[in-house]
Each structure stands twice: as structure tokens, then as C-alpha cells.
Amino acid sequence: NFENEVLRSDKPVLLDFYADWCGPCKMLSPILHELAEEKSGALKVGKVNVDEQMELAMRFQVSSIPMLVVFKDGKAVAKSVGYRPKSEIAAMVEGAR
């Protein structure tokens, strides 16, 4: 699923590495939902629970959450750790296009 949905995607993918117990992750969630709706034709947005997907978290060296990673053409092209306002996340996504 990760391979097809993220690495082979024909659009950029914004992945949110999070945990249910993480306060800043919960604050970020509605922002990511808004971005997913606004850019639905041009961007995929996904979430990875680091407690349930430890292998993926280790693969992308997630040491702090929330961590956002933008993938394009199968490669991680931008990363951000911690809470960020919507404008910064949108700029990070646009910069990766």
C-alpha cells in the first residue's frame, strides 16, 4: 500500500507521521484535512501512526512528531518537524512541485 500510494504516486504526497497521544499532532490534523480538500486534484495527503507503523517511522528516521514529509516521484523532497501553520505547510508542498 505504501509503495503504490506514496512512492508510485503521480502526484506529490504529504505524509503526516503522528501518534494519537501527541497534542501538536492533534492540532495539525484539521489543517492537513483542509489542505487535502483544497488541493485534492494535485496532492495526496496521508497519515502514518508511528506507534502502529514503527518500521516506516524508522525508515524515514522519525525522531520527533509531528513530522511532515513531502514525496515526489518516489523520493522524500521536503521535511518538517513540529507544528506548522497552514501557510508554511502549503509553501513546503508548493516548493516540492
Descriptions of predicted regions:
Residues 1-13, 54:
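A short beta-strand-turn-helix
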Residues 2, 15, 32, 49, ...:
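Residue-level signature of catalytic and energy-coupling elements of molecular machines
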Residues 10-11, 18-21, 64:
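Short pre-active-site segment immediately N-terminal to redox-active cysteine/selenocysteine motifs
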Residues 10-12, 27-48, 52:
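Conserved helix-turn-beta segment immediately C-terminal to the redox Cys motif
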Residues 13, 54, 60-69:
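Structural micro-motif
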Residues 17-31:
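Conserved redox-active cysteine motifs that mediate thiol-disulfide chemistry
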Residues 64-97:
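Non-catalytic, surface beta->alpha helical segment in thiol-disulfide oxidoreductase systems
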